[in-house]
């Protein structure tokens, strides 16, 4: 009996040694540095100046770090700037697919369509997409390989008119800078809102970068009192240029963004909040989720930013009550 027990003990010892030996490579593999995913963040505009903060990009990086993704260590990020050219954007997408990358972050619906035409397998996350329902089919359960954040840009135009009137009660003629995005459906509502505020809208279409100068000259000819820039992917690369022309023509300006570039004020979805939420999308996808698992979300946090330097350059004095409403004052 003692021999049988000893034999079983020896057998168990041998089996334990064998199993431990077989497990060693797995333990060693788990302890080796893991796979470092490579993603791409593409912008349609120009690279930001090192002297100017980018709330969106800063919050995106911070959001990744908070989730354990440290650039250069646990994640590699390919940053690309299309410098206002959709053709260049398409070339950059093709380049990144060949690299390859595991995920594409793109600025809007227009660029998402370009990326979607180039790949149906690489997940695409949209930073601020208009008409996302048409792009993904279902906001609750996106089809194919696209998800991200939607915009409420058309609805914001009504708030922009109200803010202009509150900040500058004497404004009666508002130049509306319009690009390629469709605003025909909401235009009658915009006109009715303006009329109720004692203002008249003057529409100026710019669909080519060379047309900005002539458009602003026409605004001056029409004796516009202020400028409202509509949310449009076409304008994304040119906020500094638009701001400079508005200042040159003495037009207080407002848009969904642009205050950092020199607009008098901007009101729109918080860039910092967007950056954090895009980081969350990236985190979920890198951990195994698919775009279909991640519903398209609407913006929930909005910010009023007022550029006091622009106000001073225009000789404007804004009321303390209005300034108190601002989420950020640029001094």
What are these regions (language model features)?
Residues 1-331:
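Short hydrophobic alpha-helices and adjacent helix-cap/hinge residues
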């Amino acid at each position: 009996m003692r021999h049988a027990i000893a034999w079983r003990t020896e057998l168990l010892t041998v089996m334990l040694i064998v199993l431990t030996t077989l497990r060693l490579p797995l333990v060693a593999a788990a302890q080796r540095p893991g796979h470092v995913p490579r993603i791409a963040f593409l912008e349609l505009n120009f690279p930001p100046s090192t002297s100017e903060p980018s709330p969106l990009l800063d919050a995106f990086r911070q959001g990744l770090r908070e989730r354990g993704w440290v650039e250069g260590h646990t994640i590699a990020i390919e940053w690309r700037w299309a410098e206002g050219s959709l053709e260049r954007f398409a070339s950059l997408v093709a380049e990144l697919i060949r690299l390859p990358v595991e995920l594409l972050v793109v600025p809007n619906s227009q660029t998402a369509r370009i990326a979607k035409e180039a790949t149906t397998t690489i997940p695409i996350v949209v930073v601020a997409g208009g008409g996302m329902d048409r792009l993904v089919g279902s906001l609750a359960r996106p089809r194919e390989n696209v998800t991200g954040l939607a915009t409420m840009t058309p609805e914001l135009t009504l708030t922009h008119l109200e803010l202009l009137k509150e900040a500058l009660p004497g404004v009666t003629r508002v130049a509306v800078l319009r690009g390629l995005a469709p605003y025909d459906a909401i235009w009658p509502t915009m006109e009715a809102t303006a009329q109720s505020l004692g203002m008249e809208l003057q529409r100026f279409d710019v669909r080519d970068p060379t047309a900005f100068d002539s458009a602003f000259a026409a605004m001056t000819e029409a004796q516009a009192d202020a400028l409202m820039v509509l949310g449009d992917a076409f304008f994304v690369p040119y906020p500094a240029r638009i701001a400079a022309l508005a200042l040159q023509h003495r037009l207080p300006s407002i848009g969904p963004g642009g205050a950092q570039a020199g607009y008098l004020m901007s009101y729109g979805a918080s860039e910092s909040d967007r950056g954090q939420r895009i980081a969350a999308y990236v985190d979920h996808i890198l951990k195994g989720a698919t775009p279909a698992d991640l519903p398209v979300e609407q913006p929930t946090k909005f910010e009023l930013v007022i550029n006091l330097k622009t106000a001073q350059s225009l000789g404007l004095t804004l009321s303390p009550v209005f300034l108190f409403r601002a989420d950020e004052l640029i001094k």
